[in-house]
Amino acid sequence: MWMETAVIGGGCFWCVEAVLRELNGVASIRPGYAGGHTANPTYKEVCTGTTFHAEVVEVTFDPAILSYVDLLRIFLTIHDPTTPNRQGADVGTQYRSVIMPASTEQENAARGVLAEVEAAQIWQAPLSTTIEPLQIFYPAEPEHVDYFARHPEAAYCQAVIAPKVRAFRKHAADHVRANISPNHA
């Protein structure tokens, strides 16, 4: 079976990972960093905003079940793609809304989806999502992997991540994988 990979960032990678992990067709997802100028950045370094890396997720998915275009369409509904360098209380370039295509085909698809979403006026403001070429994806430290599932009672998880997961389940029920535990959010 052939798999495709996408690298996207929409604020805190814990949030994006938690929602997209529930998406039918996703085989694996890894939080990490990309788009900056420092090799092998750490979470602490990225949080300073000086590395210019974004918190991103690397999503490996089955294109026979989930197309890259549909993944991007869903991605643009699970975070606020209209506010530059911010998601809620999380502020800084590391929280920018970004699509990092790995090929010309992905870049063209990303441009098409952004134009489609703008034209549909789904959001009240213009999109601030950028398209940046994927140079290197740096996996995040192990403590960031599947953070929401491992810390569901943490204050940030309850206040920020759980509502996003519940909203995704409600508004995109036809895209939620069948074997997700209802206790996850």
From Swiss-Prot:
Q: Which family does it belong to?
A: Belongs to the MsrA Met sulfoxide reductase family.
Residues annotated as catalytic: C12
Its annotated function is as follows: Has an important function as a repair enzyme for proteins that have been inactivated by oxidation. Catalyzes the reversible oxidation-reduction of methionine sulfoxide in proteins to methionine.
Which reactions fall under this protein's catalytic activity? Answer: L-methionyl-[protein] + [thioredoxin]-disulfide + H2O = L-methionyl-(S)-S-oxide-[protein] + [thioredoxin]-dithiol; [thioredoxin]-disulfide + L-methionine + H2O = L-methionine (S)-S-oxide + [thioredoxin]-dithiol
The entry's protein name is: Peptide methionine sulfoxide reductase MsrA
Q: Which GO terms describe its biological process?
A: protein modification process
One GO MF term, please? peptide-methionine (S)-S-oxide reductase activity
Q: Does the keyword Oxidoreductase apply?
A: yes
| EC number per UniProt | 1.8.4.11
For the keyword Oxidoreductase, the answer is yes
Q: Which domain of life is it from?
A: Bacteria
**InterPro entries from the UniProt entry:** Met_Sox_Rdtase_MsrA_dom, Met_Sox_Rdtase_MsrA_sf
Q: Which UniProt keywords apply?
A: Oxidoreductase
Instruction: Name its species.
Output: Granulibacter bethesdensis (strain ATCC BAA-1260 / CGDNIH1)
Show the taxonomic lineage: Bacteria, Pseudomonadati, Pseudomonadota, Alphaproteobacteria, Acetobacterales
Pfam assignment, any one: PMSR
